[in-house]
Every structure is written in C-alpha cells, then in structure tokens.
From Swiss-Prot:
Residues 138-210 form the HTH crp-type domain. Changing S63A: Enhanced cAMP-binding, enhanced transcription. SMART domains: cNMP (SM00100), HTH_CRP (SM00419). This is DNA-binding transcriptional dual regulator CRP.
Amino acid sequence: MVLGKPQTDPTLEWFLSHCHIHKYPSKSTLIHQGEKAETLYYIVKGSVAVLIKDEEGKEMILSYLNQGDFIGELGLFEEGQERSAWVRAKTACEVAEISYKKFRQLIQVNPDILMRLSAQMARRLQVTSEKVGNLAFLDVTGRIAQTLLNLAKQPDAMTHPDGMQIKITRQEIGQIVGCSRETVGRILKMLEDQNLISAHGKTIVVYGTR
C-alpha cells in the first residue's frame, strides 16, 4: 500500500460509472416538489438542502445532505410517485444521476448498493424521529441549540480554537426550527451572553464542540 494514496471504493466507482454526472451551482434547484419521480441522485461533491414550501411560499428546511448521500430514493419503491420536497444546492455540487429502472438492474448485479441506500434511509428515519421529538418536547431555545450542535457535526463545519465554526443565516435557522428570524436573533444573543456561542453575521462558533 502506498502511503498517502487515498483508498478507492470499487463498488462506488462501479456504481458511478453507470451514472450521468452533473454539476450544479450554489442555490440552484435540483428537484422540484410535485414533479414526477424517475431518477435517483447521489452527491459526489458538495451539499444540498431539502425543504418544503407552504401555499404562501414560506420555506422550511427538513435536512441537509452531503457528499456520499443519496437523494430522491422514495420514488424507487413505488411507481408514479411525485417529489415530496424541493432540493436546492447549498454549495456548488457534483451529482450523479441514474434512472430508477437502471438502478434496479444494477442491484441485481451488486446488492451492496441497495444495502448502502437502505442503511442511509434507516439513519434518516432515526434523525427524523429525533427531530419530531425535539419539536414536541423542546422549546424554541432548545431546538435552536440542538440545531447548532447538529450543524457543528456537518462535513462543512470548520475547526476553530474554541469549538466548531459554521456558516448559516438567521433566516435558515428559523426555517429549520420553525420560528421567525427575529426570534433566532434574540436566542443567539442569549446563547452568546451565556458564553455558549459567538455569532457574527453568518458565522457562528459553537463552543466546546471539537
């Protein structure tokens, strides 16, 4: 083994060789809610936001997905499904795309791909259960604090001498926890006063999270 040489993943490379690779700029839309679901996506590079909108166009962020995550898997298991959410590029992204029909053919050859997808779905169900619990049992301060801790574990969080540094707007935090931007601002100030975080514009340092 050559030192410093990254390890390859033969199964992943084989899967990607059957996909079409597309690049999306930051803030562009990959999936529109309501459109027919026919394609499975896999994030090669970058991160995306999964969100829903109400009739007035108000957005709520359901989750962030990152490199190595599948997108749009629900339609794989039931024909004629429509997309249940919007997916928007959080950063510039490189995404592999494959039709459900072709993916079903691939898993007949190599079931490991389906096992990877199933494992991700199980983890997401666990995260969703935790989020529902937070909505039911935590007040808005607790939900914001939990959100900051979760974001500090994301791949795009940066190490900082005092903890982990994240970049997110107050509006985006409000879209995750379900409150106004003004409420987020007040709670961030309170968390700062308690010496739990520092917040300057979009940059937030969550102390003690390294």
